[in-house]
Structures are given as structure tokens and as C-alpha cells.
């Protein structure tokens, strides 16, 4: 297992993170998974034995049950120096202040997460989604308070747009407050929109990148083929995240993953994960599952290195279109492109 610095921090995290959205099985999250305590204990040990040192969860996952189970598994102790990341923003109750990124909600939810996780500190506390009604100054100040109180060590964001991130970083700099060290984003061979703004920002601003749903909800695992959706998948259960806008492109990507996997003697899922782990700007990919074999298979991706030729084959079926203003930069600015620019435009120069 390789360990990488998380953004502009001294914290090193494994290139694979254990995700926990399948743990708990409460409410709408039952569509994703129903992993109980005994299974979760086994999966945590499996990940830690493989060298994983970061577990990612959220208060909203199964209405707190995911955090509670992880807290029970860890037993108030940190096995093998494991780091805990969690998130807050979504509504946890019916009241008007039970959601969002206000000082009121963030501080109360952080304290609730600490209790559920049976710990006195959260290593990475992430705002789970944008809140356009709470001033960023208030959100950043609340996070800064939590760090200064010793309840949180590092802060990050999730599902922010490019301008959201840059505004937040500007607020932190202007007010001399804690700064996001990472962003958690959706990024796969099928969904490469992050390459327009989010990956360049990560490179330019030294932000860590944690990738959620790196297999597109299992669509890139190789189990889904043209005209075939296996039983028991989250798509059949009504979980429509992530959206697929071009099915033909998806199947071309899956076909290429299957072909490369067969040539290498590995699984398509391992190829898809290895592609991400090897992408510039990516710090760690978050894996999850309902079965032990899913974890075992995904963990093996940590040691798989794709060749340049294999990467070119995957690019050929998945490169995102060069939209404005990038096509104009490609035409008129390619003599002075920087490292962050080339993360998107490099294949076209």
C-alpha cells in the first residue's frame, strides 16, 4: 500500500480508503447495503491488514448507524493508527436548523459524530455538500473553532464546484483560518467532469482528492454488460447515483476494462481503480461493498500499475470533450500552459 500526503498537510493516507455507506442499512441507505456489526468488523480488519489507514463515513449514512457501527468496531481505540473521516451538512431531523453548514448545525453535528464514533477527535471533518444560504465566513469560522478546540484535526469539502472551493480558500486566507486540505469528489472513467476544474484546482492549490464511488456504483466492476444488469445491484434497487447520460460510451469503457483485465489476469474493477490511483491529483479512492470478496478484489488494485499503452486505450474511449474555454486555450494558449492546465489539455497538445 502506498501512502500520500493529504493536500497541503503532513498527514499521509493510504491510496485506498475504506468507505462505509453500505454499513447500517437504515432508511434509503438500505438500497445501497445492509452491512451489520459482525460483517463491518471483518471488513475493517481486512482493510487495515491490507494497509488502509483511513475510514470514511458520514452522519447521514443510515441516520448515524454507520458511524455508530464504526465506533463499536474500533471500540474507542484506534487500531493500527487508523484515521477517521466523517461529514456533515444534510438534514438529520425535521427542524429548520437540522441541516446546512451553519455554525449551529456543524458544531452540534460534530459533537454528535464524536459520540457515535466513540472518539475524542475526528481526523478529517468534511462539509458534505454546498450550502448556498450560509455565509462561507460562518462555515469556515465554525470549522476553525472545531480545530482549535481539538475536536477536529483537518477539514475538507465534498461535492463543491470550482468556484465554491476557490471562494472557501480565499475566505480562509483572508481571515487567517483553517483551510480545506482535501476535497471528496465523484470521478471515474465514465465521469471525468472533474478534470475541467476540480482536478486542476487540486494540483494548483495543493488539495488532496478523495474519490467517492470510483466504480460508478458498480457499473465499472465488469458485472454490468450490454443488456445485462445482475440481480441485487443498487441500480435495480432504485439508487440512481451516479446518473449515466451516454450508455453507449459507458459500454465502450466497460468493454475496454474487460479486455485489459483479461490480458492482465485481474478484474475490471481493479483496472478501473488502478487508473484512478495513477491519475495526477488523486490521493485516495474510497471503496465499499456488501460482500467480503468485493473488498478483497478492490484492495488488490493498490498494487496494480497500468502501462502507458493501457492508459491510452482507456483514454481513447473515455476522454471528456474539450469544452469552452478550454478549446480556446488549446488553440491560443498552449505555448504557456501550466501543470494544472495540462492535467486536462495534455492529451490534446
Residues covered by each model-derived region:
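Glycine/proline-rich, positively charged
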Residues: 27, 32, 93-197
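Aromatic-lined glycan-binding groove of carbohydrate-active enzymes
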Residues: 194-232, 267
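Generic structural signal for well-ordered alpha-helices
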Residues: 44, 67, 71, 110-114, ...
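Terminal-tail/helix-coil boundary detector
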Residues: 204, 228-263, 278-282, 296-349
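Conserved, mostly hydrophobic/aromatic
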Residues: 6, 18, 55, 70, ...
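N-terminal binding-site loop/beta-alpha segment at the start of enzyme catalytic domains
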Residues: 1-82
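Glycine-rich beta-alpha junction loops
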Residues: 88-90, 161, 187-191, 213-220, ...
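Short, well-ordered coil/turn segments that N-cap beta-strands
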Residues: 11-16, 51-53, 78-82, 119-123, ...
Amino acid at each position: 500500500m502506498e501512502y500520500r500526503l493529504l493536500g497541503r498537510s503532513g498527514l499521509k493516507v493510504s491510496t485506498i480508503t475504506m468507505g462505509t455507506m453500505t454499513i447500517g442499512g437504515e432508511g434509503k441507505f438500505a438500497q445501497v447495503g445492509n452491512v451489520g456489526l459482525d460483517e463491518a468488523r471483518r471488513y475493517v480488519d481486512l482493510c487495515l491488514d491490507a494497509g488502509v489507514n483511513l475510514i470514511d463515513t458520514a452522519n447521514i449514512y443510515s441516520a448515524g448507524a454507520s458511524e455508530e457501527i464504526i465506533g463499536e468496531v474500533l471500540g474507542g481505540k484506534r487500531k493500527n493508527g487508523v484515521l477517521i473521516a466523517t461529514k456533515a451538512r444534510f438534514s438529520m431531523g425535521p427542524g429548520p436548523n437540522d441541516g446546512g453548514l451553519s455554525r449551529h448545525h456543524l458544531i452540534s453535528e460534530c459533537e454528535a459524530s464524536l459520540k457515535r464514533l466513540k472518539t475524542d477527535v475526528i481526523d478529517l471533518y468534511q462539509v458534505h455538500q454546498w450550502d448556498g444560504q450560509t455565509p462561507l465566513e460562518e462555515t469556515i469560522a465554525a470549522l476553525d473553532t472545531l480545530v482549535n478546540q481539538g475536536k477536529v484535526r483537518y477539514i475538507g469539502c465534498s461535492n463543491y464546484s470550482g468556484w465554491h472551493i476557490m471562494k472557501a480558500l480565499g475566505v480562509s486566507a483572508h481571515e487567517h483560518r483553517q483551510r480545506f486540505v482535501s476535497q471528496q469528489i465523484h470521478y471515474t472513467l465514465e465521469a471525468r467532469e472533474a478534470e475541467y476544474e476540480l482536478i486542476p484546482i487540486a494540483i494548483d492549490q495543493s488539495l488532496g482528492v478523495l474519490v467517492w464511488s470510483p466504480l460508478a456504483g458498480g457499473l465499472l466492476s465488469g458485472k454490468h454488460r450490454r443488456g445485462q444488469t445482475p440481480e441485487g445491484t443498487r441500480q435495480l434497487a432504485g439508487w440512481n447515483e451516479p446518473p449515466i447520460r451516454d450508455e453507449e460510451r459507458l459500454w465502450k469503457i466497460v468493454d475496454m476494462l474487460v479486455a485489459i483485465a483479461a490480458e492482465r489476469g485481474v478484474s475490471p474493477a481493479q483496472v478501473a481503480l488502478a487508473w484512478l490511483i495513477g491519475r495526477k491529483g488523486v490521493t485516495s479512492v474510497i471503496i465499499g461493498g456488501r460482500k467480503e470478496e468485493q473488498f478483497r478484489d478492490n484492495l488488490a488494485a493498490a498494487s496494480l500499475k497500468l502501462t502507458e499503452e493501457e492508459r491510452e486505450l482507456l483514454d481513447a474511449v473515455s476522454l471528456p470533450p474539450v469544452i469552452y474555454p478550454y478549446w480556446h486555450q488549446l488553440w491560443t494558449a498552449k505555448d504557456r500552459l501550466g501543470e494544472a492546465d495540462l492535467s486536462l489539455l495534455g492529451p490534446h497538445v
